[in-house]
Amino acid sequence: MRKHLSWWWLATVCMLLFSHLSAVQTRGIKHRIKWNRKALPSTAQITEAQVAENRPGAFIKQGRKLDIDFGAEGNRYYEANYWQFPDGIHYNGCSEANVTKEAFVTGCINATQAANQGEFQKPDNKLHQQVLWRLVQELCSLKHCEFWLERGAGLRVTMHQPVLLCLLALIWLTVK
């Protein structure tokens, strides 16, 4: 009986070691006061423009010139006007576990088109529209999901795998 109880204690210790107890934050005055830190904006201070900046498909314009081939005429136009074009896109379509690259790029392009309809419907400059479309396609195809890199590279280690491994070892030792 004593040997059987020692295995349960071992299982309890393993469960505590690999559980989420390390993620629990301690509460105290020291953790509440953050010296020399800027206060986070309250909900009243967050403007509609700030919310719109982070919507899916929103352009990121920082004035960087990207190395993308638009063809001879498109390259000249982009050289002269690169500061008017986006150099990034806010889009995170990686929430689905099995999303393919093609579905991800299509979703990114559709979200970008929906979020920036005014940019895409300027009828005055056809070359600007062509360069913008090519740029959006490139920016969306350059984005990636982390799990694409991990496919084929073995198992992803999650928090539950060490616990399952410990339980498997416990069952094996108990049966032995």
From Swiss-Prot:
Q: How is it modified after translation?
A: N-glycosylated. N-glycosylated at two distinct sites. O-glycosylated.
Q: Which InterPro entries match?
A: Doppel, Prion/Doppel_b-ribbon_dom_sf, Prion/Doppel_prot_b-ribbon_dom
In this entry the propeptide is located at 153-176
Q: Where is the lipid attached (GPI-anchor amidated glycine)?
A: 152
Q: Which residues are glycosylated?
A: 43, 98, 110
Region feature Flexible tail, mapped onto this chain: 27-50
What GO cellular component is one of the record's annotations? plasma membrane
Chain intervals for the UniProt region annotation (Globular) = 51-152
What GO MF terms are annotated? copper ion binding
Q: Which Pfam families match?
A: Doppel, Prion
Q: Which GO terms are recorded in the biological process aspect for this UniProt protein? A: acrosome reaction; intracellular copper ion homeostasis; protein homooligomerization
Going by the UniProt record, its keywords in alphabetical order are: Amyloid, Cell membrane, Copper, Disulfide bond, Fertilization, Glycoprotein, GPI-anchor, Lipoprotein, Membrane, Metal-binding, Prion, Signal
Expression tissues: Expressed in testis, in Sertoli cells, ejaculated spermatozoa and in seminal fluid (at protein level).
The region annotated as signal peptide is: 1-25
Cellular localisation: Cell membrane
Region Cu(2+) binding: list its residue ranges.
122-139
The record describes its membrane topology as: Lipid-anchor; GPI-anchor
Classify the source by domain of life. Answer: Eukaryota
Which positions form S-S bridges?
94-145, 108-140
Q: Which family does it belong to?
A: Belongs to the prion family.
Task: Give the matching PANTHER family.
Answer: DOPPEL PRION, PRION-LIKE PROTEIN DOPPEL
Q: What is known of its domains?
A: A short helical region is required and sufficient for Cu(2+) binding.
Function, as annotated: Required for normal acrosome reaction and for normal male fertility. Can bind Cu(2+).
Could you tell me what this protein is called? Answer: Prion-like protein doppel
Q: What is the lineage of its organism?
A: Eukaryota, Metazoa, Chordata, Craniata, Vertebrata
Gene that produces this protein = PRND
